[in-house]
């Protein structure tokens, strides 16, 4: 039976447990070898329920998508441990199977049971995006993959450590299946260090407060999140609202793929029904069921940002994913481009939610992470792989214009500075600037997209791979706001500049020394009718170079021309 816990102790324990996860984040960010973790912070840590795997606490610095999806990863380990029948203190499981743990194969998950007085108390988990985990394409974003095996090597949940003893044969297998073993070993050591720190901090916490009190706090925090979510829903009108948006293509067949949602509120519950979404496709924009459910959680957290980050928030939310759709693709369907699909899921949820709560949602953000990988060999023969994400504009809201040049709504990750990338790889950023006329018009316009131009300084058989979206279907506005500009990718060859046939996806374009690639990323959609934007704001945007005079007059009329800036 759980102990009673007073509100002050509950608040203190909540803060202490969040701090544990935050410290685990911080130690990995400092220890990781690859900039995707060290600079972009594509990683996460948390505490998870001993029997259900539900998220209890997650660090604030990790990616939001991991809040929901890591509970599925822990559940996969719980199932595997039950199958083995001998879970012990000091065991650590490792795996990257996206159909069990969500997201994609680049995300390596470590799960460690935490025991207190010989009894399982909870799980600690670490996930980080490794630089390369094999597969056909360096960096693992393969737009032409038709199964998981073409994306990366697939590791099911296996024990990396048994009762505290690292199994070197498992490490040997993992390191043999990456192009960058030094980077992978550094990331693995960082994740192991984060788990060690988590165990140490949990020992300190339970030594101070006792296991019964901390357990009661964890239960109470989930119950509180449930109650807060229900209270928020009761403030909204009952009803049903629908939205549909599209992916450009699946990288194999150049046909649009619809993602549809019906959002229904009844009292203190919400249903998100994705009936009408495209069936499983040949290419890698499928996602596994855990990823789809976790994405719904991320969207809900954006709409209700003050709610706690634990599984209790999702108790009043019913997520209905059609069997056979690209949102519930079974193994071995390719899921490497999951980021593009979940961003479209968030867009349609926001668009539908605008009918129920227009003051709580934002217009569509730029809607693609633009995963660009450039790889080659240095003059000394050593291989190099530069992999990074490239930002764009966020949507306008009832309160303000959208954020200029931010990262994706699934992410709190940062975009690595060009100086870091130029120091690490033989490239030069010839341009990194805000993109004029990229934002959707509105009472509050969207944020600005960006322009990146990257030159290869050492040829060595360099190749570029792009996995993006929004090349054919622009980010939309809400509440009568307008759409933003499209995503545009181009690459340089001897006869000039070219665009890929699939618009937003490209595989293995050869680049000689001195040749460049260029990304013009979308802005965010506008919020509210452009006619409601004050002329002074339009004039300021023209003066700042955010919008051309011609576009300003087209979108907002001539009144801004009478304003002196």
PLM feature spans:
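Glycine/proline-enriched, intrinsically flexible loops and inter-domain linkers
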Residues: 1-91, 97-116, 120-565
């Amino acid at each position: 039976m759980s102990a009673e816990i007073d509100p002050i102790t509950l608040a203190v324990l909540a803060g202490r447990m969040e701090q544990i996860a935050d410290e685990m984040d911080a130690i990995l960010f400092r220890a990781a070898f690859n900039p995707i973790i060290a600079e972009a912070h594509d990683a996460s840590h948390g505490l998870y329920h001993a029997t259900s795997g539900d998220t209890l606490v997650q660090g604030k610095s990790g990616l939001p998508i991991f809040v929901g999806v890591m509970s599925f990863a822990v559940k996969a380990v719980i199932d595997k441990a039950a199958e083995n029948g001998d879970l012990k203190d000091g065991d650590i499981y490792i795996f990257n199977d996206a159909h069990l743990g969500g997201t994609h194969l680049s995300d390596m998950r470590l799960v460690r049971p935490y025991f207190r007085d010989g009894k399982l108390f909870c799980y600690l988990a670490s996930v980080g995006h490794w630089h390369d985990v094999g597969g056909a394409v360096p960096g693992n974003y393969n737009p032409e993959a038709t199964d998981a095996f073409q994306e990366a090597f697939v590791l099911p949940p296996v024990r990396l450590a048994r009762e505290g003893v690292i199994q070197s044969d498992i490490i040997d297998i993992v390191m043999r299946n990456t192009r960058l073993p030094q980077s992978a070993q550094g990331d693995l050591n960082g994740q192991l260090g984060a788990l060690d720190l988590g165990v140490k901090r949990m020992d300190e916490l339970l030594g101070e407060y006792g296991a019964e009190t901390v357990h009661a706090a964890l239960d109470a925090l989930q119950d509180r999140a449930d109650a807060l979510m229900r209270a928020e829903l009761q403030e909204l009108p009952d009803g049903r609202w629908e939205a549909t948006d599209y992916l450009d293509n699946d990288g194999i067949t150049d046909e649009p793929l619809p993602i549809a949602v019906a959002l229904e509120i009844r009292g203190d519950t919400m249903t998100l029904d994705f009936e009408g979404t495209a069936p499983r496709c040949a290419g890698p924009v499928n996602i596994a069921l855990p990823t789809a459910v976790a994405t719904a959680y991320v969207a809900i957290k954006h709409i209700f940002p003050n709610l706690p980050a634990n599984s209790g928030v999702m108790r009043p939310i019913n997520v209905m994913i059609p069997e056979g759709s690209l949102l519930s693709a079974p193994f071995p369907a390719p899921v490497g481009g999951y980021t593009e699909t979940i961003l479209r899921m968030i867009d349609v949820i926001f668009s539908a939610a605008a009918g129920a709560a227009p003051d709580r949602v934002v217009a569509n953000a730029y809607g693609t992470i633009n995963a660009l990988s450039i790889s080659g060999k240095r003059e000394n023969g050593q291989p190099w792989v530069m992999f990074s994400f490239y930002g764009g504009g966020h949507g306008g809201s009832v309160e303000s214009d959208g954020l200029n040049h931010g990262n994706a709504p699934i992410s709190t990750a940062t975009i690595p500075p060009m100086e870091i990338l130029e120091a690490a790889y033989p490239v030069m950023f010839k341009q990194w600037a805000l993109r004029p006329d990229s934002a959707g018009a509105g009472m509050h316009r969207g944020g600005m997209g960006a322009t990146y131009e990257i030159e290869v300084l050492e040829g060595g058989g360099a190749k570029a791979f792009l996995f993006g979206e929004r090349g054919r279907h622009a980010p939309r506005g809400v509440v009568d706001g307008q759409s933003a500009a499209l995503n545009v990718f181009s690459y340089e060859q001897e006869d000039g500049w070219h665009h890929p046939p699939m618009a937003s996806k490209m595989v293995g374009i050869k680049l000689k020394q001195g040749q460049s690639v260029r990304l013009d990323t979308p802005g965010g959609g506008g919020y509210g009718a452009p006619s409601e934007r004050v002329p002074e704001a339009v004039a300021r945007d023209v003066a700042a170079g955010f919008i051309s005079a011609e576009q300003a007059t087209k979108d907002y009329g001539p009144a801004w021309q009478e304003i002196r800036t």
